């Protein structure tokens, strides 16, 4: 979220986002109308159009928020020579704290390009450069697709492991497959 947004704007946007997540649990983004979003959020359409041009713009804003948070946990103040586990725990905890939103965004029926957007972040693309040669793209796809599948499976379990437990599993798999990995 933008730092210059006041509390009222943030609340309106949150209500719109929560309403879209709720609606996407029952229908595709293509069948959700702005009127339905506004009705569910109890916000008029003028307010909606003040911030977004369509339901797709709202979805993109939601995706951008998640990608920004994940990218912040991957990079920023975290030392890349440090332990991968700390970064994984932060990402899994963020997903756990925003489970409904992440379940919705990680559902391939909503935006099939979301996994690609998530793993094309500069901090994730670092993996490709670390494993040069003709196999680097395959290694990157293997790790990213597998990571995405693990996260989706974990999110959809009824009795999920704690973020720390799944992060340990995740980190263990990565360290066995790529013992020199420092990309996350």
Annotate the PLM regions:
Residues 22-29, 72-73, 98, 127-131, ...:
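Basic, amphipathic alpha-helical hairpins
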Residues 136-157, 161-177:
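Hydrophobic alpha-helical segments that form the core
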């Amino acid at each position: 979220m933008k730092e210059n947004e006041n509390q009222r704007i943030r609340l309106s946007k949150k209500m719109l986002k929560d309403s879209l997540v709720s609606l996407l649990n029952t229908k595709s983004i293509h069948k959700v109308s702005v009127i339905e979003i506004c009705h569910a959020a109890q916000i008029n359409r003028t307010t909606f159009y003040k911030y977004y041009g369509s339901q797709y713009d709202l979805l993109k804003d939601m995706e951008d928020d998640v990608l920004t948070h994940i990218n912040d946990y991957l990079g920023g103040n975290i030392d890349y020579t440090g332990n991968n586990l700390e970064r994984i725990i932060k990402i899994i905890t963020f997903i756990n704290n925003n489970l409904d939103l992440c379940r919705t965004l990680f559902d391939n029926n909503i935006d099939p390009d979301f996994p690609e957007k998530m793993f094309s972040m500069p901090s994730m693309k670092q993996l490709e450069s670390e494993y040069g040669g003709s196999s680097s793209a395959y290694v990157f796809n293997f790790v990213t697709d597998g990571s995405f599948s693990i996260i989706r499976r974990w999110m959809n379990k009824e009795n999920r492991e704690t973020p720390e437990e799944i992060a340990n599993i995740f980190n263990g798999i990565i360290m066995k497959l790529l013992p020199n990995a420092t990309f996350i």
